[in-house]
Design a protein with these regions (language model features):
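Flexible interdomain linker/hinge and immediately adjacent N-terminus
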Residues: 1-12, 110-116
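Catalytic-site neighborhood detector that most strongly recognizes the C-terminal catalytic loop/helix
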Residues: 69-71, 75, 169-194
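Basic, Lys/Arg- and aromatic-enriched nucleic-acid-binding interface segment
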Residues: 10-42
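Active-site-proximal segment of tyrosine recombinases
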Residues: 44-46, 141-142, 152, 160-170, ...
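Short, basic (Lys/Arg/His-rich) helix/loop patches that form interaction surfaces
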Residues: 18-22, 126-163
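Basic, alpha-helical nucleic-acid-contacting "clamp/cap" segments
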Residues: 72-112
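Short alpha-helical segment immediately N-terminal to, or the first helix within
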Residues: 34-35, 154-155, 168
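Conserved tyrosine-mediated DNA breakage-rejoining catalytic core shared by Y-recombinases
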Residues: 47-86
Length: 196
C-alpha cells in the first residue's frame, strides 16, 4: 500500500474543485476546501455541525470570521480565521440546502430511521476524495490525511516557517512535520541547488 501523500500540484487541486462545482457537489467541495485550508483532521471535519458555522447573530460565517473547533484527538481548541475559499464553499453549500438545522452534521450522507441525519463516514470521505482524484489523474497515495498533508505542504512551499506549520498540525518536532507533509530528501537537495 502506497503512503498517503499531499496533492502537490495546484492545477490538480483547482481541477478537483472545478469538477465538484460543475457537478454541484457543494458538500464535497466544502469538505475538500475546508480540509486543505485549515489542516483539520478528517474526524474533526466530519464531526462539524451547522451551528459551528453560524455566529451569535444567526449569520453564516464569512471571510475573516473565527471558527473554533475542539479537536477530537487532542481535546484542544483549534481556532482559525475563515479564508475566502472556505467562505465561498460554505455559502455555496449552505445556500443549496433548505434551512439546515444547527444540530445537523454539515457533511451528512443519509437519514436514519428516526429521520435524523448521519455524517458521512471516514470511508465515505475516502471514497469521495479518491473519485475526484482519479478524475484528475491522481491514482495513488490519496487518503483522508491527504487534505491535512496538502495544507501543510502548501504552507511550506509558500515559505511559512516550519515551526508555525508544526504548531498548526500539533506535531512534536519539525522532522515529523517534514515527513508528514511529504517533503522528500530530493526536494531538500533541490533547495541546496537553487541557492546559487
Amino acid at each position: 500500500m502506497k503512503e498517503v501523500q499531499p496533492i502537490r500540484d495546484t492545477k490538480k487541486i483547482d481541477a478537483m474543485k472545478s469538477i465538484m462545482k460543475g457537478e454541484s457537489n457543494y458538500r464535497d467541495l466544502l469538505l475538500f476546501v475546508l480540509g486543505i485550508n485549515t489542516g483539520l483532521r478528517i474526524s474533526d471535519i466530519l464531526a462539524l455541525k451547522w451551528g459551528s458555522f453560524i455566529n451569535g447573530g444567526g449569520r453564516l460565517l464569512k471571510t475573516g470570521d473565527q471558527l473554533n473547533v475542539v479537536e477530537i484527538k487532542t481535546k484542544k481548541v483549534k481556532s482559525f480565521v475563515i479564508n475566502r475559499s472556505v467562505a465561498e464553499a460554505l455559502k455555496l453549500y449552505h445556500d443549496s440546502l433548505v434551512s439546515p438545522n444547527p444540530d445537523d452534521p454539515v457533511f451528512s450522507s443519509r437519514k436514519t430511521d428516526d429521520g435524523s441525519l448521519q455524517p458521512i463516514t471516514r470511508i465515505g470521505a475516502w471514497q469521495m476524495l479518491n473519485r475526484y482524484a482519479n478524475m484528475v489523474g491522481l491514482d495513488e497515495g490519496i487518503g483522508t490525511h491527504t487534505l491535512r498533508k496538502t495544507f501543510g505542504y502548501h504552507l511550506y512551499k509558500k515559505g511559512v516557517a516550519l515551526e508555525y506549520i508544526q504548531k498548526m498540525l500539533n506535531h512534536s518536532s519539525p522532522a515529523i512535520t517534514l515527513r508528514y507533509i511529504g517533503i522528500t530528501q530530493e526536494q531538500l537537495n533541490d533547495i541546496y541547488v537553487e541557492l546559487n
